[in-house]
Structures are given as structure tokens and as C-alpha cells.
Amino acid sequence: MFADLNSLPLSTLAKAQKSLSRKSSSSSSNGRSKEEKLALMKSKLAQMQRSKGKAVAVPDTDSHRFGSRAQESDEESDSGPETTSSTKRGSKHAPAALSTKKQVSRKRQVIEVPKPERRDPRFSSVSAGHANADLHSKSYSFLPDLLRQEFSGLKEAVAAAKKAEKNCPWAEKPMRTAERERLEVQMGQVRTKLVRTEKEAMEREVLAKAKKEEREKRTQGKAAWFMKKGESPKCEKKDLLLKARFETLEKQGGKTAVKKLVEKKRKKLASKEKKSRPFAKGAEGMGRDTKRRRVA
């Protein structure tokens, strides 16, 4: 065998020696790396148990036999999770934890200043002042006429929509019905605006007439008289407006319209009175049974 080795050239022997040394070094490094990984895992487990306050059952003395290199790698690997776990809460009821490395702002809010609200100067009470209802009604006196024109146009449109809904094919029925309902809702809104506008105009006219009469009486030497305001039964303003309302209604629809309004008001008050009763009509008390029983 030795004779065979002596017959080989030196270059071949050098290559063989190099390959053998490489295999031996790789096997030793693999074994060492496995031992280092095991030691690191043991040290991490021991550190986690210490942080939770449990008894350390895994010895971490194996990590010292590999020198400072293993210790440095252990510290580098543990530095990341340790900083993140320090800011975590132990439970959901615990207060939030903040890192001490974060710089605190030097700004302090000593007095809470209310946040300024942006206002439109056109509609602000500070710049616009009090609105004059008489001046507003005179400036926009054309609005009631526009509302009447719009109401008459919508009335005609509703009549045409009803006719189209009645004569349309079955497939177009839902579309025609929706269009008719939309026009009716719009007409109701315009009617409400028109009635409110006419009522306000009537009230302003009645109050202006009463003030004019009072000024004339003062010029004749009579004492000053001020109209009582409010919702009391002795309120002159309420009585005056109610009387003017009935007079206007009588001019428009006659005495029949006034009777209908009075009857409607009476029924409304009667229903309110019935609802406010402590027990039903004919019952003698709250505890008794008011149902009729069949007599055998």
C-alpha cells in the first residue's frame, strides 16, 4: 500500500489531503453549530422563565463554554424581543405602557381653550342683528305668488300623472305610480309652505292694525294699553289672532267651513281627554275587571 502511495505524484497526494482536511473541519463545525444552537435555546428558555417569575429548571451554564462569541449572539438575539415585550401589557385591564426611550413633548396644555367655531357672517346674529319680519315680508313679497304658481302647476301635473297611471300598460304601472306619489309629496310640501306664508301674513296684518288703532287712541288722550302675550286664557293676542283666523275662513269657505273646523277641534280635544283618563269609561276602579262576562 505504501508502495502504491509512493508511486503517486505529489499533486494528487496534495489534493487528497486537502479534501480530507475539509471534510473533517466541516463535520467538527456542524457538531459545534448544533451544540451552540442547543445552548442558545436553553438560555432563552431560562430567561423567559425568569421574566415570568417561575423557577429556572433549565441550566444555562452550557452557554459559557463557547466563549464570548456565543454570549454576543445570545445578547443580540434577545435584545429585540425583550424591548418589545417590555411595552406589552400583562392583561387587557392593565394601563398602557410606553417606552422610556421616546422623548416627551415639552408642550403642555395648562388651560383648555375652546375651539373657535367658523360662522357665516350672512347668517350670524352678531353681524346681522335682529331680523325685521315686516321688512323681510316686504322685500320678498313676490314669494307667495311664486308658491301659488308652483302649486297650480303641480296640481295639473298630478292630475296628468293620475290619468297616465290609469291608462298605462301593466309593465309601466310601478313607474307611473312612483312618479305620481313623488308629485303628490312635492305638492303637499308646497301647500304647507303656502298655508304657513298666508297665515303669517294674516297675523302680521292683524297685529299691525291693532297697533295702529292703539296709537290713534293715544292721540285722542286715552291711557296706554299693552297687549298680553303668551298661552294663557286671558291672552289678548291669542284671542285676536283666533278671531281673525275664523273671519278669514268664513270669507273663504263660509260658515260651513267654520263649523267643520270647530267640530274637528272639539273631536281632537275629546280624544286627548279620553287618553288622559286614569281608567276607561264605565269602570269603577283601576283594580276591577272591566270585561263583560257571559251569564249562564
Swiss-Prot record:
Coiled-coil stretches noted in the UniProt entry, renumbered to this chain: 147-203
Domain of life: Eukaryota
GO terms under biological process: maturation of SSU-rRNA from tricistronic rRNA transcript (SSU-rRNA, 5.8S rRNA, LSU-rRNA)
A Pfam cross-reference name: RRP36
Cystine pairings recorded for this chain: none
Residue ranges, annotated region (Disordered): 15-135, 253-296
UniProt KW keywords: Coiled coil, Nucleus, Ribonucleoprotein, Ribosome biogenesis, rRNA processing
Subcellular location: Nucleus, Nucleolus
Gene Ontology CC: 90S preribosome; nucleolus
Cited function: Component of the 90S pre-ribosome involved in the maturation of rRNAs. Required for early cleavages of the pre-RNAs in the 40S ribosomal subunit maturation pathway.
Subunit structure: Associates with 90S and pre-40S pre-ribosomal particles.
Full protein name: rRNA biogenesis protein RRP36
Organism of origin: Cryptococcus neoformans var. neoformans serotype D (strain B-3501A)
